[in-house]
Every structure is written in C-alpha cells, then in structure tokens.
Amino acid sequence: MLFQKVVFYLVICSLIRIFVPKKITNKKKTMKKVLILMVMACAATAVMAQVKPAIPRDVALEAKVEKTLAKMTLDEKIGQMLELNLDVMGKTTVENAKVDREKVRSVLQQYGRSAQEVDAMVKLSDQEIIDKLGAFPVDIYQGETKRVWKLNEQMLDTLISKWKVGSILNAPGSSAATVDQWQKWIRLIQEKSMKYLGIPDIYGLDHNHGVTYTAGGTLFPQPINLGATFNTELAFRGAEITAYESRASNCPWVYNPVVDLSRDPRWPRVWESFGEDAIVNSKMVAAEIKGYQGDDPNHIDGFHVGTSTKHYFGYGAPWTGKDRTPAYISPQLLREKYFEPFKAAALAGTLTMMVNSASINGVPVHASYEYLTKWLKEDLQWDGFLVTDWADINNLYSREKVAKDKKDAIRIAINAGIDMSMDPYSVEFCILLKELVNEGKVSMSRIDDAVRRILRAKYRLGLFDEPNTGGKGYEKFGCDEFAKASLQAAEESEVLLKNDGILPLAKGKKILLTGPNANQMRCLHGGWSYTWQGSKAENLSEKYNTIYEALCNKYGKENIILEQGVTYNENGAYYDENAPEIDKAVAAAAQVDVIIAAIGENSYTETPGNLTDLWLSENQRNLVKELAKTGKPIILVLNEGRPRLIADIEPLAKAVVDILIPGNYGGDALANLLAGDANFSAKMPYTYPREINSLNTYDYKVSEEVGTMAGAYNYDAKVSLQWPFGYGLSYTTFEYANLKVDKSSFTADDILTVSVDVKNTGARAGKEAVLLYSSDLVASIVPDNKRLRDFTKIALQPGETKTVTFQLPAKNLAFVNAEGRWMLEEGEFVLKIGKLTQNVQCSQTKVWDTPNI
C-alpha cells in the first residue's frame, strides 16, 4: 500500500506540474483540471495495483538506495553501469612455453577466423602469439606448460579510482582457480571499491552447474539433466549448494539459471537449459532461484547469491541453429512459450537478467524497448537490472548493423533498457555514455534508473554491510554431503530409452567398453566445467570416475576390457576425431559377453559448438555397426548435450541409455543404474528426432500430423520421432487409474482439481514423474496437439499406490490469439495423464486486456 500511495502522490505532482499553470487566473477551470488529473492518477495507480512488484518493496532498503544515489557524481553512476573482465587487471604468463603452430591454426579455424588471419598469426614469434592468445583457455603449446596469472594492483587502482568500475567478471583465462585465490582477488577488488567509491563491486561468474570456476567444488549434472529428472527439489538443492560454494569463493553473483527453451536440436546450448518445454523451465527456474537466493530476495544472506537468469529471451531458437544468429518467432509463440520462463523468474525474484545476444524478427533484443522495458520492467513491475552478454552492445554496430558506431549502439541499448554493459576489455563505454548524457541523447532519469537497479541488487546482497564472504563458516565446501546430492541428481537424470531384457546387467559377465566417451571426464562434465569449453576437465577431476573407472569399481577391473575404437582429437575442434581403430574393438569383442558402447559428443559451448550435421559421427556409427556383426549384445550409452541422430544404429542395440551430461558423478550413477543398484526414473526433456528434416517438438501443431486427403493429393505429413518428450523407462512398472476432474464445465476464473492414482505394479521401488497434459480440440488459431500443464515426481514402493493431485487454474488453458491477446475460448478440452483422459468444457469465452494473466 505504501508503494501505491507514493506512486499516486508522484503521479499527481507530476501531472499538476505539467498541466496546472503556476499563476491561477480561473479557479473554476483550475479545480476542474485538478479533478480530471486526480481521476487520471487513480486510474493509473489502479492499473499498477493489478501488477504487484515481482519483489515486494523494502522501504528501508529503498531509502538506502536513494541516499547512495543522491551522493553520486555522473562519472560514478556511469562506472556502476560497466562490467569488465578480470583479465584486463592482470597478466598471464606461460612457463615453459613453446608454441605449436599447427595447434594455433586449428584453434583459430575452430573459432571461425579467416585464412588470412590464420596465416598472419602463425607467422608471428612465439611471444607475440602468447601475448595475443595466452590469456585464453586454449592449448597452443608443445609439451607441458604452466599458466600463471597475476593481478596488477596498479591497474585495478586505475580502473576503480578513475573509471569507477562497478562490476567485474570471469576467471583469469576462463580457467578455474582455488578458493584461496578467489578470496585474495575479490577481497582486494572490494577493498579498492570501498576505498575509492564507498560502493562494493558485484562480482559475477558462470557457475552454471556448480562452481564452474572454483577448483575442488561440486559440479552437478548440467541443466538438461535436471530437466530430465522432472524433480524440482533436485534443482533447488543443486542451486543451494552452488550458492554456498560460490560464497565460499567470495563470489556473490552467478550467471544462472538458463531458461532458453531448447526447441532446436542443432543449437549448441541445448544442454544449458531444462529442455524444450516452457512449464518445465518455469518450475525449475523458480526452484533454482529460491535455492540460489534463499527465501527473501530483499535480504540475501552470506550463504546465498544473486541470480542472473538468461538469456532474455528467444535466444535458443536461431533460424540456422547456429549460436547468436537471428531468430524468427511468431508473436504467439514468443509470448506463450519463450517469455513464460522469464516471467516465472521475475516473479520468483531473480535479481538480474542477462539479455539475448541475437535478434528476434529483425530486432536485436539489446535494442528493443518493447522487450526490455515494456514487457519486463513495466508489465511485470520487475525492479532488477539487465546486463548484456559478452560485448553485445558492440554487436549492434559490428554485426547487427542497426547502429553506425559504438556511441550510437550505447545510445540505443541504454535507452532500450540495458542497465549494465558487459564490455570486457574497454572503458570506452564510460567516455561515450557520458558524452551521450551531456548531449541530451540519454537522459539522467534513465541513468538514475539503471544505477538505482544496480545499487538495489548490491544492497539486497548485503554487500554494503559485508563486501566479502568465505573462510570460517564455509567448511562444508566440497563435502561428502554435497557429493551425494550430485550423485542423486545424476541417477535421477539418466534416461533408459530401450531395454530388451538385457538390463539390469548381472555381475560376473565380461564386458567390452568401447567408444570415445568411455574414459573421459570431459565428456561427462560438458562445457562450463573448470574452463569455458570444458576442455581441461581431466586436469581438475582426478578424484572422480570416468565410465570406465566406475564400471571397473562395480563389476571388477578384471571383467572390463577397454578398447575405444574411436577417440577424440583433443587438439582439434570438439567434433574432431583421430583415425579410427575399429578393428581393435571388434577383435576384443571375441573375449566378452556384452558390449557397452559409450558414444556421443565431446564438450563444447556457444559458437565453437556449432554443427553442420545432426547425425552422430560416421566413425562412431561405423563402430557400432561393425561390433553388431560380432553377434554380441550391445548397450548404447549416449553421452551428449543434444540429440544426435542414431536411427541407423538404434535397432542394433539391446538397450539404450541417454546419460546426457551428468557431471562429476555421472559415471558412478551409470554404473549403479546398469547394475540395478539404482532405478531409472528420468524422462526425456526434449523430443529426440529420427530424421534430419523432422525436427518437431512435442507440442507440434495438429496440422503437422495429417494422413491422406480425399482426392488425388496425398498430404501425408508425419511426425517422425526416435523418442518423444517425456519418455523414459524403469526397472519397475506403474499403473494409472481413476483420473478425476472436479468440474466438467468451467470458466476462466475457476481452478480445476485434477487427481489420479498411481500404483507401482512391479517388484522394485521406483520413482515416477507424473505429467499432466491438455489438448484444445477446436480453436480460432491452429492449436497445439497437446501442452504440458504441470508435473510432479513421486516415489513408490512395490505395490504402493499414491494419489497425485494437481491444481490447474483454468486461465492456464488460454492461448495468445491472432490479435496478440490472451484468450480462453468456449469449447472442449481434453486433460490427459498417462493413457487416461477426461473431457472438460469451457462454458464462456474470455479475452484479457492485460499482457500477462
């Protein structure tokens, strides 16, 4: 109420200043104006009252923000809006460095550099190449080297005292450091910030599935695995542990969760989100934000962190499948699905959001006032701050060509609603933004709004009172309790897709383990694991078990033969493979009872993970085909971040397990599951395609699946899937019965209570993800064939029955109509759980005037 009263007062004052003359000559006319203005103000505040602030306002905290803001100079305000990379404050030296020019050539080609650039680089001296590439986490050296990074205190002084920089990010060389190193670096940064500015720095790291950049911390399965668990409690616990270990490292801000809907399997960041569905992403992001930030986003304690939900929004749908390329998304799809998880994040209280690097329908998101300010800040009353991704304001002129130069790009982005620029290597942002303010091209009110949002986040994190955390009180860093949580998440995330009676695999059998993913931690961890691309995981994960090591522990080393047949070229791009040695694997098969083929992908992320062919590599498929000729039963283990096509080898396997990217304990989890010491309970978080030109999602339009039409023309549109979204097997069986809905007829304001009985009819204990779908049978625009509306996960002992109940607001069955408005139409809907269905009737059409319902 206080907030609304303040708004009312401010609106009245502003309108009176604008419309009422300073000298009143006609009292009657003036009073009439005032009455009209009061009505207008009441209407304005009534509209605002319909949308509560995403995070409830704390009056005392807001007063502190305003007091700090009032003391700041323009230079200090602009400095708060800049985020620099830590690398610019130090220097990397490489001991025993001798450059391998073929590696340099390979690295540059992998990152898309032109032939001329590559030729010019390899002609430089060793030291010149090291100066240009040494800070990056790429291997360009002959033999063993040691990379040493040292903070330059004088440079740090200059950047904070002169340029007033308010945020720093990243790890030196994008490589993991120790807890002690993080403590030392960030404490020094905070000392300088408090000394020169009286305002703490907000330090950010990509701790995407655990403490990516802190050696010795806990890494969890990647987000795509958490999506496969359909268990929000695991998402919450993983985030809670990551927050604790981040704060132990003195890092208060993480660039996570990721809720870009992974609806295109070609995209190289599929595995960084929770999958293709909006509801799964929405429920998971709400759980993770609570785990990261705690119960009160206004007062985040020293064991929790601020979140930066990313990448707002539509980032996961590039038209070409290539990272950071344009997306073309219908208004309906954009509002109904791609926006929904970010709305959930805002309402869950995420402190910040990171913005989509690309464009939607020709408009760069960094340049869109509609998306940044209207949809997010105004419509949702979200008061966090928006940060760019890596140098993305620059891309408005260098790549997107919507600005003539950097200054113009800054003007466009800041006026659109960007609050902080991640401009990693330059302070030019400060110079140019100050010029824009002085020229009147960016208003002081826009600057104050951005800085107010940044200060608010710093106060909410408690950084003004205690800029540093870590040391005493963080003894649980990397403890067994956290390891068990990671193992449980891995066990619940690995999906059994096929089992022709071969699993569980009895002990005492001789096993051939083959394939490029058989003995590598890098593949189990994926990108954002100790380094940006995850390419150095082997050096920092010696205490964890590869698939080979885990199977040796489970079945006995004497029963496991390792002959990979195909291996990755670790000096090349993620997809590069060495010359195959399939004949060796085939020869080894003669000595065993069963073959486990661990195949899939090496680690990657972002642009280096782009692909030109969704099929699994020819070498790996040939390996399976040749092994199948031996007649020995094959178990396929897919270790991949996106669904690589395997339609030609799946029929050759007796069982298929997709472990996705399961993290530190993924190998141990697999061994437990294969042996039957744990039970499979995961379900596919995305649709697994069978064919290269049939990349459907589960909620495809009904017109995408049509048979023969009357007459001569055969429409024959078919959805061809390898495995559908939500599919996954178990060692036990579940029976659904008694699907009930408390209302057969409903209106938009109703809540439908949907219940179903689930019984474990098998001989093993198991967990089951229960999924509630709806279908709109007839609509004014082509309806989806079905939509997931809710889910939960339950544990059942053999013979046990539980009743699962969902509360489904009827308005959730609405869609965005052709005019861009939410609409619930009169007509019939089908609710479905398992194979059971119930028909319900909407008795009255409703169209909403608000952008969100």
Where would I find each of the regions flagged by the language model?
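Glycoside hydrolase catalytic-domain context in secreted enzymes
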Residues: A46-A814, E825-I833, T837
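Short beta-strand elements
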Residues: Q838-I853
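Flexible, membrane-facing loop/turn or short amphipathic-helix motifs
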Residues: N817-E819
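Bacterial Sec-dependent N-terminal signal peptides
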Residues: M1-P53
